[in-house]
Amino acid sequence: MPQRLSTTVPILVVGFFVPFAAGAQTGACGVGNVRNWCVSQDSAGVTGVSQAGDHFGAALAFGDFDGDGAGDLAVGAPGESAGGAANAGAVWVFYGSAAGLHAGREQVFDQDNLPGDDGGTESGDQFGFALAAGDVDGDGFDDLAIGTPFENQPEPGGTCGFDLSCDDVGHVHLIFGSASGLDAGRVLVHTPEGSEGGAEGYSLAIGDLDGDGDGELLIGKPGSMAVSLGGTVRSGRVFALRYHGSGTLVGSGGSGQDPDLEEDAQWGFAVAFGGFGPGGSAAYAAGARHSTVAGSTRTGRVSIQDGLDGENLLELAQTDYGSAGNAAEDHFGFALATGDFDGDGFDDLAAAAPEKNDAGVGDSGRVYVAYGSPSGIDPSQFQILSIADFGGNPPDTGDRFGAALAAGDYDGDGFDDLFFGSPGRGNDDRGFVYFVHGSASGLVIGAGFNFSEPSLGGAFQEDALFGAVLAMGDLDGDGADELAIGVPEKDTGGNASGLVYVTRRFNPNWIFGDGFESAGPALWSATAP
């Protein structure tokens, strides 16, 4: 299968992942207790059956699709067979309530049951590879964007980089929300024009770029041709699209390219909206994880652009964060997250380099946080985090700390908090998630903690990659965000069939505080209260 991977939007955080080998099989996943929920295709009330390679949970997005004040959760399974086509992909949507996640109210989408897609399901399309949620048409209901980056629409001429064949052009579905939820009869499909290709929909985000109250749709195309370095190279592009009253998506302006990037830079590999511009004005960040910086190949960089005119506001490399250095294959810009960690009203930007050799340990990973200011993102006000900041065992080779990021106000104190996925952490890539609180002085390094599947009532599994995908949103409408954790390599009904955990108010002091451990596994198949 082609490579997979994470992206974010303010408040609504989405993610996707890179698959690895799967391990031994485990049992099905039930839905819920008072603190945590767990869902797979084998959960009671969920349509479908887990099968090997489904990768359920490979993409996640929270949005309020029915406008009831409680967030809803979209889950991508890009390896799902649909219409008899292997790896065609499908998306599940579970609706939230004051009681949390309920598997009884769901919708399932694939390319065969949505209008406007003449090609329908095809093997290898991977519909649901990336997801994003937000209100694009301004009607008060969030809409859902679904990326299908490996859709086959032959691209004429040229050679393709990005380890993709030239027919991996891709497209994006936009399903509109309503009082009854997502409306499968009201769908737009955006496809590249002419010879433009390059895995459209590999990353997605929705946010308001022009201040009119309606969200723009940001589409990452990391394998696309662009004018760069005095020529046309496959460095990647990013497009911001707005909803037009005639029922179409139109460009909001800007070039959609970074003129300073080279062939195979993969700009648009990850994207994020935020108030990154002067005075907190809206802009977007895009990661180019393969960009060469100061002679270091594939060390990566992040560009911040004004989405309306395409002006490059800032380019960030690891050397912009104090004494941090660039090295080949760091992949800085692999994952991005937006949050106001110090509560000053200006958005801050977290950017990961999960293959960074921290303290000499290969591919252990680092995350860089640049704080916002009245003049925009200020990399001179920064923090650098790694596993070493959490005490306990030191970093190990292949931890990939920061391979997924999610930001939101998890503890309800008014400051955004930051979660880090480390899917390679633990024996045989079991995976861990790390967490730090926000505060008036920023992220509180030294007061964070980590957890794994057993912390949430599950069981360790080799190669599960717990934490490969993260997302945050307010599932129960109480004003504080929940965390969703995708485990797309989990063996529920077959190797790498996948599952998703959702947890709220996680705190080391209450993880066993609601009594579920005394009841054994029974609560984990109970109906959520």
Q: What residues fall within each predicted segment?
A:
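N-terminal secretory signal peptides that target proteins for export/translocation
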Residues: M1-S6
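Bacterial N-terminal signal peptides
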Residues: T8-P19
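Conserved beta-strand/short-helix segments
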Residues: A22-W510
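Extracellular carbohydrate-recognition regions
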Residues: N509-P521
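Short, low-complexity, Pro/Ser/Thr/Gly-rich segments in the mature regions of secreted, periplasmic
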Residues: P521-A528
